[in-house]
Amino acid sequence: MYHINNTKRYATLFAFIIIVLFAGCRSTPQLKAGEGYVTVKGGKIWYRILGEGKQTPLLMLHGGPGGTSKSFYQFASLGEDRPVIIFDQLGSGRSGYHTDTTLLKVENFVEQVEALKTSLGLKEFYLHGHSWGTALALEYYLKYPKGIKAIIFNSPYFSTSLWKADADTLITTLPDSIQLAIKTGEKNHDYGSPAYKNANEVFYKNFGVRKTKLTSELDTSTAKGNEFIY
């Protein structure tokens, strides 16, 4: 009888351990739609969770640096399948504004992503980067690869020198007046002049977003990017 009782005890204990182990190995806890802030070095970053789908979350990294997550509202419909996590990197959008050059280091941007991941308890997730966000995604993966199921590189930017060489080639195909405005603005470091802004708009209309920008009913944020950081 003692042997039988002990066997039952061990079986019960074993079952309990298995349950605990499975609970400990569970994937990311179910995220709820909403927004909040996470404290990081230099201030707080704003984030928003779109949707409460059951599949693996998607974490979005916007471009810039100095851009915002505003355009990511176009991905809101994906929230029916999985939580879509957007946030504004420190210094722009709804996150703490700053012009502190000591904070403009890649490692600080990487730690912002890690702080958000930790705060939300993400165990597994997909990482999406756009433009500068692709470089940030790569840098983040090199330091914190655990939990990343895949990375999506959208309009990738991995090298400033290569990007500039490509841009210079494209600029030569634009009208002379546009080329002159760009050359003058960059020579004088005057990126706010009407001529330069117009030339920049022409460049992106030709080589960036060629179609009418998509809109979202959620796209109501008036938070702006940070030109100083950019």
Regions found by a protein language model. Give the residues of each.
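N-terminal cap/lid segment of alpha/beta-hydrolase-fold proteins
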Residues: 28-44
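Active-site loop/oxyanion-hole signature of alpha/beta-hydrolase fold enzymes
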Residues: 89-132
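C-terminal motif of bacterial Sec signal peptides marking the signal peptidase cleavage site
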Residues: 21-24
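Flexible "cap/lid" loop of the alpha/beta hydrolase fold
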Residues: 151-188
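Bacterial N-terminal signal peptides that target proteins for export
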Residues: 2-12
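Conserved hydrolase catalytic core segment
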Residues: 123-166
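Alpha/beta-hydrolase
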Residues: 183-230
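Conserved HGGG/HGGXW glycine-rich cap/lid loop of the alpha/beta-hydrolase fold
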Residues: 42-97
